[in-house]
Amino acid sequence: MSKQQRRNFLKTIGTAGLGSLLAPNFLAQTSDDKIFKSEDVDLHEAKRKNGVLTLQLLQTTDVHCQIFPHDELFWENDKAVFRKTGGYAELQTFLKQLKKKNPNTFLVDTGDMFQGSQLSVETTGQAFVPILNAMDYHLYLPGNWEVIYGKQKMQQLMGALRAPKVCTNMYHDLGNGQKGELIFQPYQIWEHEGIKIGFLGYTDPLVPLRQSPNYSKGIIYTKPEENLAHYIDVLRNQEQCAVVIMLAHLGLSQQIALANDPSCKGVDYIFGGDTHERVRKPIQCAYSKVVEPGAFGSFVGSLELDFENGKLTAERYELLEVKAPSLKPDAQMQAILKSNEATFAAEINRVVGYSTIPLYRYFVVENPIDTMILNALDWKFPEIDIVLSNGFRFCPPRTTPDHTGNIPITKGFIFDMLPVDSTVRTAEVTGQQIADWLEKELNNVFAKDASKRFGGWVIKFKGMEVDFLAYAEQGMRVQKAIVGGQPLDKTKTYSILACERDGDPADMLCRIKGVKNAQNTVHTLHKVMESYLTTHKVVTPTPQGNAKVLDAPQTLLTQVTGVSYEFK
């Protein structure tokens, strides 16, 4: 963002917006008048029927800075269908409707609220502070991407949000591996008419490995098992909470594994995030139930709890779709969105190319979005044997044609696909390194032990063809690997290309250790994408089967197994 653009942006958010950016992060009180802010209801009037008090807990997660309605993919009758969902103004209207029906409502967001769009990058997340504050959330959990602008900026952004923040496993790093105090408060209690609901929060402890290490420099993460039992005891026995909810940004597999661990005994529900899974029926595990409400503001998770004489007597969970066409945008929120984006709108909406097919990133193995990225890299660097791209999950679909009959790809959509404009980096590796790396990457996605699953979907590649068994034993998944039309030669040296990760060792590329002759190019991912699209004008990025799963459908939509769950 240029200095002039920044000045213009700061003018648009106004004095109130700046105040919220600089507001200190005080611990919120738990009385009703501090929790509820809706002007539409009598805050002291309980929703009762036949002596039953119903409390409603609402959750959003992984919105990834998608401020306007967008195309969304649904899997129905074994095929992809698309509908318009989300948008903060539409979401605000929807939430107000839910709060009006039941004023006894507590709204949480479980992370990835400051990363995922061009507007976020241009303003280093600041544009989203007034948006989130206007949404009247009651509690936040930082996600794995809240550190994208560094620790200090994360603290400033989270601290500018008026509602409290909870995270029970992020500590200040005092140096030499010494752990300091918690960065955020460890728990929060909502008390309503004598009923206490306690909230804990755990974000992904693997952030320093999953993302560029320098993003989370200065932070020590711990596994939930290290202090979970202690804080459950505090909430259950000291604070006498009737219900304990864990806010989590660990991924559905990890959340299920945790809910089956004895340390989780005493947690009623895990409100999960990170993997963008859509849990429509709570997953019952040994000690807790697990839910996760999708991503991009397309859904709201709703848990209703009935109490009689202070005792929990019934519970109901729904995954609610935010159907944008049927929701009138909230006028106040719409004004905030348009004002905050005004300085950058022309560039965000600038069309750089077109696709003839829908663009999405929901399949575990291969997707059109990733195919387009790989095609662009391969076009720019034809001399490289294998081009690689991370198995990212974020980015909503883009499926709506314009007047040309094709689907426009804007500059803003490039940011949606690739929020970090990383430098393109090349290196050399042996066939043995590739073979070992492939097995490790596949185990990260499909490990039988859910607690060992790590990161996003299957790594994406072009120049190499791999057939694999998703559910084979570790180290035995790859059945065939071909590079340049020939079987992978473990003694041969191959050239590879991927994105640079800030803070990685000089001899590491795309999590492959010990690479040789690694060097940065003069190109970034965004420059390559824009050059490719403006040159080709119209593309058809159909996946070519570079990765083929032999024991599951190529349209696999989740890495979760062993429980009653399907993505749809």
Segments and roles (model prediction):
Residues 36, 44-94, 100, 129, ...:
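Catalytic centers of hydrolytic enzymes
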Residues 2, 6-323, 364, 368-376, ...:
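Acidic, metal/ion-coordinating pockets
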